[in-house]
Every structure is written in C-alpha cells, then in structure tokens.
Amino acid sequence: MRKTITDIQQMKVRGEPIAMLTAYDATIAALFDAAGVPMLLVGDSLGDNVLGFSSTVPVTIEDMVRHTAAVARGAQSALIVADMPFLTYATLEMAVAAARRLMQEGGAQAVKLEGGQAMVPIVRRLVECGVPVMGHLGYTPQSVHLFGKARVQGRSAAAARRMIEDALALEAAGAFALVLELVPAQLAAAITERLRIPTIGIGAGPHCDGQVQVFTDILGLRDDFKPRHTRRFAELAPLIRSAVAAYVAAVGERSFPTAEHSSRMDEAELREALEGLS
C-alpha cells in the first residue's frame, strides 16, 4: 500500500526519522522502493543530474510529468512528490494547471514548490484544490541566477528570523512538510521545533525530522561533484566504468555472446528458409 502524507506526518509524531531520495525513472524507483525509502522526490534536479543541464531552470513541465509517471510506475509503496518546475507556479491559475498535470498525468501524490511568504496564496489555493504541498526554504535552486551559486542561507539574525516566519506561514497555509536546504543546523533545529509538520533537510544538519539527498550523490555516480552536505554510501562510478569496459572488451574479442546467450532454430527450417537465396 502506498504511503500517504498522514503516514509521513505521523513519523514526525513518533520521532521516526524520514529518509527521502530523488528518483527519475522506474528502475531506480523500484530499487529504492524495495529498500524501504518512504518518500521519493521527482526533483527538477533531473536537469543537472539526468538531462545534462547546468541547473534546474531549463526543466519543463513536460519533463517533470514524464519522469514523475516513470517513477510512479516503478514505486509501489513510497509517497511520490514532484517538483513544480521554474515559472510554472507564477500565478494561481498556472500553479493549479501544473499541479493537475503532475498528479493526473504524472501520478504524483504531492507537489513541491520553492519560496516563502510570497508563496502562501499559491499553497493555500493548491491545498483548497486537494493538492498536498511540500514547501522549500533556504537555498532554492530555481533562483540560482539570483543567488549566483549554492550557498548557505539564514546566517544573519534578520535572515534567520525571516526564514522562521516563512516556515510558519507555509505551515499555516496548509503545507504538509517543508524542505530546508543549505540552512545552518541551529536554525534548522529551531524551525523544526516550532513546526507541527515535518522538516526535511538537505545540508541543514542532523536535527530536521528527515533528510533528502540526490541519489547520484550518495551512490557516487558523479566524479565531478561531491557536495559537503552529502555522504557517499557507495562508489558506483568506477564499478560501472569497469563493467562497461569489460563488456566492450568481450564484444571486441568475440567472447560475448556465447552459445548460452543465444537461441537456435531447427536446421531443416533454416535450410528451407535459405533455399534458392544467393
């Protein structure tokens, strides 16, 4: 049975840490589902982790619908949250239209959007329409061109106070959970203590109710990128390169495929098929 937002919120009540991972396709989603990940994020991070872009900004609603649908087909138990991509929730009407596609066509159970108090009317309207919404504060990747680069947010007293107020406003608007990205650990703890809804941290210290990571980071699939806030639980890049190199070599020396990898037909049938052919 698929997890619900109530299940996720009850994990906070019980003090049970919430593990969340990104997923972008059915195969990976099925693996993570079988491993017991309770919540999967179809992130617009697919832009710089799958599609080859340098940021999340170029990701479209069509991209998100397609990848969300793939994840929904692969995962049978995890709650699936889909990112609303850049400028798809600039107005109430746009937000409702984008959320409808992600849920009806993509099969998501919830959507995630970035921003603080300015997003309150959007969150409230989506919740009124029956759309569970996850908020996102701190560093917001869709605003990369404003930030210049990924950097910790909320270090000053004024910025920290503003983030606390944003978090409370999003909760009051109906958000069921809140991502805190690149936030000082003490501030993330203070926000977590003040909210009834779960906080999900990424680069926000150990005191959030849960953690989310980009799966390519924790599995070591990219040699060129190792953010401080992640831990590599595996180093798959060299294993994959070695396996693929072995495949290329086996094909090159004709040691693969062999008879055990092949099928055969009756010789009489083959002779009949070839009869009269040059």
Curated annotation (Swiss-Prot):
GO BP: pantothenate biosynthetic process
EC class (word): transferase
Residues annotated as the enzyme's active site: 181 (proton acceptor)
Keywords, in A-Z order: Cytoplasm, Magnesium, Metal-binding, Pantothenate biosynthesis, Transferase
Cofactor note text: Binds 1 Mg(2+) ion per subunit.
Cofactor list: Mg(2+)
Pathway assigned in UniProt: Cofactor biosynthesis; (R)-pantothenate biosynthesis; (R)-pantoate from 3-methyl-2-oxobutanoate: step 1/2
Protein location: Cytoplasm
Binding positions for Mg(2+) per the UniProt entry: 44, 83, 114
GO cellular component: cytoplasm
Pfam family, any one: Pantoate_transf
Entry keyword Cytoplasm: yes
Binding residues annotated for 3-methyl-2-oxobutanoate, in chain numbering: 44-45, 83, 112
GO molecular function: 3-methyl-2-oxobutanoate hydroxymethyltransferase activity; magnesium ion binding
Cited InterPro entries: Pantoate_hydroxy_MeTrfase, Pyrv/PenolPyrv_kinase-like_dom, Pyrv_kinase-like_dom_sf
EC number(s) on file: 2.1.2.11
Chief location: cytoplasm
Annotated catalysed reactions: 3-methyl-2-oxobutanoate + (6R)-5,10-methylene-5,6,7,8-tetrahydrofolate + H2O = 2-dehydropantoate + (6S)-5,6,7,8-tetrahydrofolate
Role noted for this protein: Catalyzes the reversible reaction in which hydroxymethyl group from 5,10-methylenetetrahydrofolate is transferred onto alpha-ketoisovalerate to form ketopantoate.
Protein family per UniProt: Belongs to the PanB family.
Listed name of the protein: 3-methyl-2-oxobutanoate hydroxymethyltransferase
The organism's taxonomic lineage, starting at the top: Bacteria, Bacillati, Chloroflexota, Chloroflexia, Chloroflexales
Name of the coding gene: panB
